Each structure stands twice: as C-alpha cells, then as structure tokens.
C-alpha cells in the first residue's frame, strides 16, 4: 500500500510518502532520505521501498525544503531546516511503529544530514540501524563544485540557481552552514557504508578514511558501480546488503578496511 501525506511543524511543511506491505503487519520501519536535488520519489527510494516491502518493511520517505513537492522556497533550504525536517519525519514514523526496529537508508546529502542529526535522532527514536549510500562527507566542497565557483566568487554573487529534479537556488549562507559541520569524524553508532568503485563524484578515499576512524562502521565497495549504481547488478547488491544489515546488522561480503 502506498499513499502521500504531509506533516507540519512550526514553519516546516513536509511532503511524505509511505509504503506498507500489502500483506501482514510491518516487521521493520525504514526512513528513506534522498540526496541533494532529489526527492522522496527518486528511483532509488521507490525501488528500495517496493523491494523491501516484499520482506515486510514499511518505508517513509520525505522531501527536504525546496526539493520535490515541498511548498517551501529556496530561502528555507538551510541546514537547520533540513535537520528538523528529518527529525520531524522520524518522530512521526517512530510514533506510527513504536515497537519496530528503526532503520534509515540515506544517500549523498541525505546521509550528510543524517550524520549531522544522529545524536538527536537517537534521542527521538532510540537505536538506529543505519545504511549510508555514497554519503557526502564533504558537502560544502561538493556544493562549490555544483555552483562551479570558488568560495570568494560564491560570496560575491550570494545565490546560484541549480537545475536538478526541481530548479532551486542555493545561497552562500547555506554553504557557510555546511562548512560548520564536517561529517568525516567519529560516531557511536553501527553503520553500513555502500560506495561505488567507479563513483565519479565522491572520492572513495573519504570512505576508507571514515571507516578507519569508526570502529562500528562496515564499508562495502560495489564493484564497477558508478555514483548512481546504474551498473548491471549493482542495485541488486545494494538491496541484498541493506536487507542483511537491517535484519541482522551484519553483511555477508567482507568488509574493506
């Protein structure tokens, strides 16, 4: 079963999409967190929700401000608003499924926001089973690459329009907010990192460095996979690894150290 709905919290308006198994009660809950310029309706989150639903998982996905169906404009795209959007949706999902394991599948920028919010997130929902697909550990640097400017040029223009699934602006203030949190640090949470061997956007070296400073992190490099995991067989491997982690917090493939 699939349906759309909206959540509200103070100034936030959050479009959401929920998938529940067609037969039987859900066994686990997944919060799906999209990447920068994406939405709750991206192919990755849709495929994940549909495939995991076969195994009894419910999935809740949402749009960040200025993404997807969000009525919030580009000025609402701040790091604080993204964190609060994540926490609000997580709280709703946890209240709906209070007795189920709480799992998170987050990609790119969504993984970055999840790491920013992780300590508060665990206060809201308790223990989290976390899968990060191609996490963007240097989001501020990535944003400079997307606007094709150095920091001084961006400061001078203050605002740049990006063409993604939806056209929106990014501001220099948003860039400065991203500078305040470097995700390449240590965390007290078991997690699985999935990264494409031939990712053309995010450096694999960051993933190895993250793994080395986080003892509870498992890293799997998907052979021949690009940033979008479009290589034949790559997405099937992502699904299998994600299911293994969410059900048993282990992976059958060996970890890369």
Question: Would you name each region that the model predicts?
Answer:
Residues 112, 124-213, 217-221, 226-257:
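The alpha/beta-hydrolase serine catalytic core
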Residues 37-49, 205:
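The serine-hydrolase catalytic nucleophile loop
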Residues 34-39, 197:
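Active-site glycine-rich loops that stabilize anionic/oxyanionic intermediates
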Residues 45, 49-71:
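Conserved alpha/beta-hydrolase
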């Amino acid at each position: 079963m699939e349906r759309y709905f909206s959540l509200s919290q103070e100034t936030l308006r959050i479009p959401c999409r929920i998938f529940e198994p067609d037969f039987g009660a859900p066994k686990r809950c997944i919060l799906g967190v999209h990447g920068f310029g994406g939405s709750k309706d991206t192919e990755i989150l849709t495929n994940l929700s549909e495939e995991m639903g076969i195994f009894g998982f419910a999935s809740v996905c949402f749009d960040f401000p200025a993404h997807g169906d969000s009525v919030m404009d580009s000025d609402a795209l701040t790091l604080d608003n993204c964190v609060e959007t994540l926490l609000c949706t997580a709280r709703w999902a946890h209240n709906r499924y209070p007795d189920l394991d709480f799992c998170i599948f987050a990609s790119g920028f969504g993984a970055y926001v999840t790491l920013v919010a992780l300590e508060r997130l665990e206060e809201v929902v308790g223990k989290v089973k976390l899968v990060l697909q191609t996490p963007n550990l240097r989001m501020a640097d990535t944003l400079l690459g997307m606007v094709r400017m150095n920091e001084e040029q961006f400061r001078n223009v203050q605002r740049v329009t990006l063409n993604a699934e939806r056209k929106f602006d990014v501001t220099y203030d948003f860039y400065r907010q991203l500078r305040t949190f470097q995700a390449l640090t240590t965390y007290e949470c078991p997690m699985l990192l999935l990264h494409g061997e031939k990712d053309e956007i995010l450096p694999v070296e960051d993933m190895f460095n993250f793994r080395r400073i986080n003892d509870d992190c498992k890293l799997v490099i998907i052979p021949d996979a690009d940033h979008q995991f479009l290589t034949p067989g790559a997405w099937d491997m992502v699904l299998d690894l994600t299911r293994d982690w969410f059900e048993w917090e282990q992976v059958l493939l060996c970890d890369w150290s």
